[in-house]
């Protein structure tokens, strides 16, 4: 899977995070893995704010799937 670095804005906090997104053909969605643990008890929505330059994909952090269109359109996403 080709990775795309993304900048994430968590809508319920002052925190920002960076992460990697990759298209998952089985689910027809984007698999996102964050650098941090900002998907907490209250974090239910995020905005894919932009792409960014980063180094290696994270080895830890939160992981979830979102619709592929969310990254293209940079729209708000409600987490499952």
What name fits each language-model region?
Residues 1-80:
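Conserved RNA-binding domains used in RNP assembly and mRNA/RNA metabolism
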């Amino acid at each position: 899977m080709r990775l795309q670095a993304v900048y994430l804005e968590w809508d319920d906090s002052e925190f920002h995070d960076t992460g990697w997104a990759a298209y998952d053909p089985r689910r027809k969605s984007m698999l996102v893995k964050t650098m941090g643990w900002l998907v907490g008890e209250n974090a239910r929505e995020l905005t894919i704010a932009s792409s960014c330059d980063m180094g290696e994909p994270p080895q830890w952090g939160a992981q979830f799937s979102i619709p592929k269109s969310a990254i293209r359109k940079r729209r708000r996403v409600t987490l499952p």
